[in-house]
From Swiss-Prot:
<feature type="binding site" description="axial binding residue">
    <location>
        <position position="197"/>
    </location>
    <ligand>
        <name>heme b b566</name>
    </ligand>
</feature>
<dbReference type="GO" id="GO:0005743">
    <property type="term" value="C:mitochondrial inner membrane"/>
</dbReference>
<dbReference type="InterPro" id="IPR048259">
    <property type="entry name" value="Cytochrome_b_N_euk/bac"/>
</dbReference>
<keyword id="KW-0830">Ubiquinone</keyword>
<dbReference type="InterPro" id="IPR016174">
    <property type="entry name" value="Di-haem_cyt_TM"/>
</dbReference>
<protein>
    <recommendedName>
        <fullName>Cytochrome b</fullName>
    </recommendedName>
</protein>
<comment type="subunit">
    <text>The cytochrome bc1 complex contains 11 subunits: 3 respiratory subunits (MT-CYB, CYC1 and UQCRFS1), 2 core proteins (UQCRC1 and UQCRC2) and 6 low-molecular weight proteins (UQCRH/QCR6, UQCRB/QCR7, UQCRQ/QCR8, UQCR10/QCR9, UQCR11/QCR10 and a cleavage product of UQCRFS1). This cytochrome bc1 complex then forms a dimer.</text>
</comment>
<dbReference type="GO" id="GO:0046872">
    <property type="term" value="F:metal ion binding"/>
</dbReference>
<keyword id="KW-0812">Transmembrane</keyword>
<feature type="binding site" description="axial binding residue">
    <location>
        <position position="98"/>
    </location>
    <ligand>
        <name>heme b b566</name>
    </ligand>
</feature>
<dbReference type="InterPro" id="IPR027387">
    <property type="entry name" value="Cytb/b6-like_sf"/>
</dbReference>
<dbReference type="InterPro" id="IPR036150">
    <property type="entry name" value="Cyt_b/b6_C_sf"/>
</dbReference>
<keyword id="KW-0999">Mitochondrion inner membrane</keyword>
<comment type="similarity">
    <text>Belongs to the cytochrome b family.</text>
</comment>
<keyword id="KW-0679">Respiratory chain</keyword>
<dbReference type="InterPro" id="IPR030689">
    <property type="entry name" value="Cytochrome_b"/>
</dbReference>
<feature type="transmembrane region" description="Helical">
    <location>
        <begin position="289"/>
        <end position="309"/>
    </location>
</feature>
């Protein structure tokens, strides 16, 4: 009998073991679709980004008009740009849902997979930030100025660090060129980290909604989950194309239709919607260094999650109190997102401060406490 190339060829064998003959739990729900959706997002973003980079000029005098030129004169340039800009939003929707799934079902107990995932989130955030600066509109320029300026809060080396990052004494041409270089490079770093993420995942196998060992009941990834993933792709690509074709500027800021002007500050500087929760936490602390530390902590706290798991059961499927707390956390994040988009005035200041406090309290104190309480309740 001739050897099966799919199982014997050094390269095809790797593809086979991770996408075709991979044993997967039979009961994983649609919440397990987001990993593959993120893969599709990454591929779409790299493809559209490559096409955009061919028409982009990373120079302060030409950046804005080169983007306008792409939209006006390049074949389907408007579509490529709209897919790229809104694709970023869908990337973040998918990653937030993916993290939420991991949190709800205790997937963070696979520590290496979880930690590489958090590193992926941080890299994605960095990529989105430097990418937002490239069109060189008003919000691009002032967003870059405000966020890079935060590094000046670091004691002793802060100011030097900021000027080193800027390549001068303000956000200018050197900043734009290096941000373009970084924006081109980082997606490939994300792709590399994704492979590490998957390598760690395939060491343990997937978790499942019950959080129990499922080795006795595994099914092949293909055709069952390949088909399910294709359904997921359709469910994501449909709203993405709808958004890109019907209201491409819905999630953008109108300020970005104005070319960058260092002499005029926009009335409300705010980032894209996917950073608003962190921005609200940053603004809720009146002290600059304190705000920067809170901003960093709001994302880095994810590294602590595996150590804060005190429950005997892995998932929240049969833990109603933890479920309630989880949805309170989700609501809290939505409130933070809303507050981040509002001006700094009463009542938004106090709402933001309370929501920020609640965010850290839930994660650091309430989840471990409720987990321990539920353990006690199991004994009765």
């Amino acid at each position: 009998m001739a050897p099966n190339l799919r199982k014997s060829h050094p390269l095809l064998k790797m593809v086979n073991n991770s996408l075709i003959d991979l044993p997967a739990p039979s009961n994983i729900s649609a919440w397990w679709n987001f990993g593959s959706l993120l893969g599709i997002c990454l591929m779409t973003q790299i493809l559209t980004g490559l096409l955009l980079a061919m028409h982009y000029t990373a120079d302060t005098t030409l950046a804005f008009s080169s983007v306008a030129h792409t939209c006006r004169n390049v074949q389907y340039g408007w579509l490529i740009r709209n897919l790229h800009a809104n694709g970023a939003s869908f990337f973040f929707i998918c990653i937030y849902l993916h993290i939420g799934r991991g949190f709800y079902y205790g997937s963070y107990l696979y520590k290496e997979t979880w930690n590489t995932g958090v590193m992926l989130l941080l890299t994605l955030m960095a990529t989105a930030f430097v990418g937002y600066v490239l069109p060189w509109g008003q919000m691009s320029f002032w967003g870059a100025t405000v966020i890079t300026n935060l590094f000046s809060a670091i004691p002793y080396i802060g100011q030097t660090l900021v000027e080193w990052a800027w390549g001068g004494f303000s956000v200018d041409n050197p900043t734009l060129t290096r941000f373009f270089a970084l924006h081109f490079l980082l997606p490939f770093v994300i792709a590399g980290l994704t492979l590490i993420h998957l390598t760690f995942l395939h060491e343990s196998g997937s978790n499942n909604p019950l959080g129990i060992v499922s080795n006795c009941d595994k099914i092949p990834f293909h055709p069952y989950f390949t088909l399910k993933d294709i359904l997921g792709f359709m469910f994501m690509l449909l709203p993405l194309t709808t958004l890109a074709l019907f209201s491409p500027n819905l999630l953008g800021d109108p300020e970005n239709f104005t070319p960058a002007n260092p002499l005029i500050t926009p009335p409300h500087i705010k980032p894209e919607w996917y950073f608003l929760f962190a921005y609200a936490i940053l603004r809720s602390i009146p002290n600059k260094l304190g705000g920067v530390l809170a901003l960093a902590a709001s994302v880095l706290i994810l590294f602590l999650v595996p150590f804060l798991h005190k429950a005997k059961q892995r998932t929240m499927t049969f833990r109603p109190l933890s479920q309630l707390l989880f949805w309170v956390l989700v609501a809290n994040l939505l409130i933070l997102t809303w507050v981040g988009s509002q001006p700094v005035e009463h009542p938004f200041i106090i709402i933001g401060q309370l929501a920020s406090l609640t965010y850290f309290t839930i994660l650091l104190i309430l989840f471990p406490t409720i987990g321990a309480l539920e353990n006690k309740m199991l004994n009765y």
